[in-house]
Amino acid sequence: MATLNELAELIGGEVVGDGSVVLNRMAPIESAGPGDITFVANPKYLAKLKDTTASAVIVKAGIECPGVNLLICANPYLAFAKVLTALHAQRPAPQGVMDGAWVDPSAELGADVTVHPGCVVGKNVRVGRGTILYPGVVLYDDVQVGEDCLVHAGVLVREQCRLGNRVVVQPGAVIGSDGFGFAPDGKSYYKIPQVGIVAIEDDVEVGANVCIDRAAMGVTLIKRGTKIDNLVQIAHNVSIGEDTILVAQVGIAGSSKVGDHCTLGGQVGVSGHLKIGDNTMVGAQSGIISDLPAGQVFSGTPTMPHREWLKASASMRSLPAMRKTVSNLQKRIEELEKLIKER
């Protein structure tokens, strides 16, 4: 619960209307009513403003709506996220080690840590202040988890792997499983021991059922601020830069390096031992088989500059007609050749 003036101070916005109105929750513009605050970031929803009964609306400068309290800001979508956090995202009170959890005596737990039933915390594990381990989390020996982390149900972190501060790991993720390393011996495959670790820096979010393999030697590294969607596979010795986005079902093969501020769309596949430069965007379902330079947009399999891919995709639609045309031309050529021979 907060007043509109308080929320304006939080996001650095300007109030138009009654700043003393009390707001209880954030709601979609279609269903927001009295006591709710909503937002409009996409221009196509502006028409809904005239019918809203919300107590306040977050909008960009220049938008007017008589009779509606407005919170004016430069970035309504970012403001929405901050207000949603302020009104809804309250962390539960710390509960310590709950009945049904098993914590090795050698483990070190910081102040205000919560360990839910079904958790297993191994030898010499360190868990930082304010971190919550939800039911069924398993931390192998020598794992380090930083402060104010949320490790959700069923997450497994294998030996010696490290999580920084404020890391969020969604249910079912596996961090530090063996990398896919096998040496052919002429008859079969000899398993290569995977003796490295996974290191995840501060403010990273790992989605549900993500798998991040430990390095064969050294470190599989996820740098600060990166966000990983559900069902992503990151192989051994991969390095992901800062503030990079990996959308669902991305797969990155071993030893590839993705730069800072990159975005890989859903189901992008990256071959091994490649380098993707900073600020690179790759469209969904693309296949990357060679290094990509920084600051460009790519699509397709194999990847090509996005504009070239658009042209190629447009040509694909014409292929049936082109095939028919070529077939007709071939027949005409054959007929002409036959006439020439007959002369």
Swiss-Prot record:
PROSITE patterns hit by this protein: HEXAPEP_TRANSFERASES
EC numbers on record: 2.3.1.191
Secreted is among the record's keywords: no
Catalytic site: H236
Associated pathway: Bacterial outer membrane biogenesis; LPS lipid A biosynthesis
Biological process, per Gene Ontology: lipid A biosynthetic process
Catalytic activity: a UDP-3-O-[(3R)-3-hydroxyacyl]-alpha-D-glucosamine + a (3R)-hydroxyacyl-[ACP] = a UDP-2-N,3-O-bis[(3R)-3-hydroxyacyl]-alpha-D-glucosamine + holo-[ACP] + H(+)
SUPFAM superfamilies named among the record's database cross-references: Trimeric LpxA-like enzymes
GO cellular-component term (any): membrane
Purpose: Catalyzes the N-acylation of UDP-3-O-acylglucosamine using 3-hydroxyacyl-ACP as the acyl donor. Is involved in the biosynthesis of lipid A, a phosphorylated glycolipid that anchors the lipopolysaccharide to the outer membrane of the cell.
Record-stated family: Belongs to the transferase hexapeptide repeat family. LpxD subfamily.
Protein name in the entry: UDP-3-O-acylglucosamine N-acyltransferase
Originating species: Syntrophotalea carbinolica (strain DSM 2380 / NBRC 103641 / GraBd1)
Underlying gene: lpxD
